[in-house]
Design a protein with these regions (language model features):
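Conserved acetyl-CoA-binding loop-helix of GNAT-fold acetyltransferases
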Residues: 136, 142-155
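A short beta-loop-alpha structural element at the N-terminal edge
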Residues: 7-22, 33
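Conserved acyl-donor/pantetheine-binding loop and adjacent beta-alpha core of acyl/acetyltransferases
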Residues: 77-130, 191-194
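Helix-loop element at the rim of GNAT/NAT acetyltransferase active sites that forms part
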Residues: 22-38, 77-78
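Conserved GNAT acetyl-CoA-binding A-motif
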Residues: 128-129, 156-168
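Conserved active-site alpha-helix within GNAT-family acetyltransferase domains
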Residues: 147, 167-191
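Active-site rim helix/loop that mediates acceptor-substrate recognition in acyltransferases
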Residues: 36-58, 63-64, 72
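Conserved beta-strand in the GNAT
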Residues: 60, 66-75, 117-121, 130-135
Length: 213
């Protein structure tokens, strides 16, 4: 869809949370393995509450009062106290542990976390901020919304951001915005009875890199 006017950008509000959860579901549904809809719902909420605990900022793109994109930044090693979010995350984690589908997806989630740890930059130069989640609704892509979201953090903070990306993420898009792959690891995975090599790469953007439109 070609937009007739430029989208607006602002900090997320509580009323946006349901749409952000929907974006998380859309982004990850092809990476999870499930037959029961409650498994998908619990995984979505587990990821959402995890992002809320570790967030620095949550920026949304809106078009005609509709949320069409979101960018969440934060530090996975420095979470907020956030007792309500932590309680809800723990609840959905336990519900997933009680089912075979849930345990299988949690096992894969833990493997991905281990892969990320292998890619972590040296402790002598830690990365100040991570992009935890970036998503633009498919109907509104190719309108510069992803670029606009990245510009929000480039103007708000003078820092170098990093992002972990797997083979289903838009790596070419991030590379066009100055992100450079620093390292990559892979492992074999079975999803829906198909085996494939899953990879996770660590991308980093140096400060003052220009953002392409």
């Amino acid at each position: 869809m070609l937009l007739k006017k430029a989208p607006a950008y602002r900090k997320a509000e509580k009323e946006d949370f349901s749409m952000i959860r929907e974006f998380i579901r859309r982004n990850y549904k092809d990476r999870w393995e499930f037959e029961e809809t409650h498994t998908e719902k619990r995984l979505t909420r587990l990821f959402f509450y995890t992002y809320m605990i570790y967030r620095d900022s949550v920026t949304v793109a809106t078009y005609r009062d509709q949320v069409v994109g979101v960018l969440i930044t934060g530090k996975e090693s420095h979470g907020h106290f956030a007792p309500i979010f932590r309680l809800k995350k723990g609840y959905h984690f336990l519900r997933l542990k009680f089912t075979k589908e849930g345990r299988k997806n949690l096992e894969h989630f833990n493997k991905l976390q281990d892969m990320k740890k292998q890619l972590t930059v040296s402790p002598e130069k830690p990365t100040p901020g991570n992009i935890l989640f970036l998503y633009v609704s498919k109907d509104y892509r190719r309108n510069g919304i992803g670029t606009g979201l990245l510009k929000q953090i480039s103007t708000e903070k003078d820092t170098d951001y990093s992002i972990y990306m797997d083979q289903l993420d838009q790596r070419t898009f991030m590379e066009s915005h100055g992100f450079v792959k620093k390292n990559e690891v892979s492992q074999m995975r079975e999803l829906n009875k198909k085996r494939f090599r899953e990879s996770v790469a660590f991308y980093k953007k140096e400060p003052h890199c220009e953002t392409h439109s």
